[in-house]
Amino acid sequence: MVFKMMYSEAILDYANSKKFRGKLDDATVIEEGKNISCGDEITLYLKVEDGVVKDAKFEGMGCVISQASASLMLERIIGERVEEIFSLIEEAEKMSRGENFDEGKLKNVTLMSDIKNYPARVKCFILAWKTLKEALKKISRP
């Protein structure tokens, strides 16, 4: 059932979490992303020093899936090298398409692995990841 995966307690907790919400005044890069088909919006703020994401926040509005995905993503990337993050984005994309992916790399992001079973919601999940990819392209090459 769609509601079991998408609205599990853990996913609701991530969607409602304030831990990664807000702006970063000292952000290295800011990127906006929108899902025009459903109205989800996100603005990512990344602080990158010496090729490592030191801090990250987001502002956004949208469904539980898009907001939980953004929180899980930021939890996963803080402390990682930009080069490794491009690889994480690729793994998240594979997961969303139902392809083989490295669960160990994605860690808690795998809470949303059932998204592959709900094609209409994949765009909601992937919005944060696509926005992250565009942000990182501004400061590095994949």
Curated annotation (Swiss-Prot):
Record-linked CDD domains: IscU_like
Sample GO molecular function, one term: 2 iron, 2 sulfur cluster binding
Superkingdom per UniProt: Bacteria
GO biological process: intracellular iron ion homeostasis; iron-sulfur cluster assembly
Pfam families given in the database record: NifU_N
GO cellular component: cytoplasm
Protein family per UniProt: Belongs to the NifU family.
Protein role: A scaffold on which IscS assembles Fe-S clusters. Subsequently gives the nascent cluster to other proteins. It is likely that Fe-S cluster coordination is flexible as the role of this complex is to build and then hand off Fe-S clusters.
Assembly: Forms a heterotetramer with IscS; each subunit of the IscS dimer contacts an IscU monomer.
NCBIfam families in UniProt: SUF_scaf_2
Protein name according to UniProt: Iron-sulfur cluster assembly scaffold protein IscU
Provenance organism: Thermotoga maritima (strain ATCC 43589 / DSM 3109 / JCM 10099 / NBRC 100826 / MSB8)
Gene that encodes the chain: iscU
